[in-house]
Design a protein with these regions (language model features):
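Structural/interface elements that position substrates and couple domains in central-metabolism enzymes
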Residues: 1-180
C-alpha cells in the first residue's frame, strides 16, 4: 500500500464495513511465544504441505525488516535537515498492546537492531519497570527528547487524545494504526 500511496488503515477500515470481512490490524510484525514460533514446528515436520505457512511467517518476519528500513529513512531525513544525530523514540517493546510480555517481540527486535547499528534509541514501554538493554523513558520524556518517533505497539497510553495528537503533529511513523 505504501508504494502506491494508499493509506492501509483507511483501506482496512473501509473493507471492514462489509459484514463478512474482518481484516485484522497489521503491526510491526508478529510476536509472542505461540504465533511467532509454533508454525515453524509444522513447517519443519512437513515442509511440502506447509508452504503457505512458511510463506506467511516469512512475510510477517519481513514486516519487521521493512519497519527498520522505514525508521532508518526517517532518521536520515532528520539528520539531513538538522545536521545532527537524531534520537529515535521506539514507542512500545511488548509483543502486543497493554501487556508486559516481550517474548519474540518484533518491537523489541526493532529497537535492539537500531541500537546495535549505532542509532540513538530511547525506549518507551509503560508496562515494564526496567530492561537490561534500554534505559526506559516515559512517553512525555520521549516526546520532548526524540527527533524520530516509531509507534511500534498500540498501547492504550499512546491512544490517549493528547498523546495521539502530539504523535500526529510530530509525524510519527505509525506501524500499528494509532494516528489513523
Amino acid at each position: 500500500c505504501a508504494k502506491e500511496g494508499i493509506n492501509v488503515w483507511n483501506l482496512i477500515q473501509l473493507a471492514n464495513r462489509h459484514p463478512r470481512v474482518n481484516i485484522l490490524q497489521p503491526g510491526a510484525g508478529v510476536g509472542g511465544h505461540c504465533i511467532a514460533v509454533d508454525p515453524w514446528f509444522i513447517v519443519a515436520r512437513d515442509p511440502g504441505n506447509a508452504q503457505l505457512i512458511r510463506t506467511a511467517r516469512e512475510v510477517n518476519n519481513h514486516k519487521t525488516v521493512w519497519a527498520i528500513d522505514q525508521i532508518k529513512i526517517a532518521v536520515a531525513d532528520a539528520s539531513a535537515r538538522t545536521g545532527c544525530k537524531p534520537k529515535v523514540a521506539c514507542l512500545g517493546l511488548a509483543f502486543k498492546p497493554d501487556i508486559d510480555d516481550l517474548r519474540e517481540s518484533p518491537a523489541l527486535h526493532i529497537a535492539a537492531a537500531l541500537n546495535a547499528q549505532g542509532y540513538d534509541v530511547v525506549a518507551v514501554e509503560p508496562n515494564i519497570k526496567s530492561h537490561e538493554q534500554f534505559e526506559l523513558a516515559s512517553l512525555e520524556e520521549a516526546l520532548e527528547s526524540a527527533d524520530v518517533f516509531a509507534v511500534l505497539v498500540k498501547h492504550r497510553q499512546f491512544l490517549a487524545p493528547l498523546a495521539k495528537q502530539k504523535l500526529v503533529e510530530l509525524k510519527a511513523l505509525d506501524f500499528c494504526g494509532i494516528t489513523a
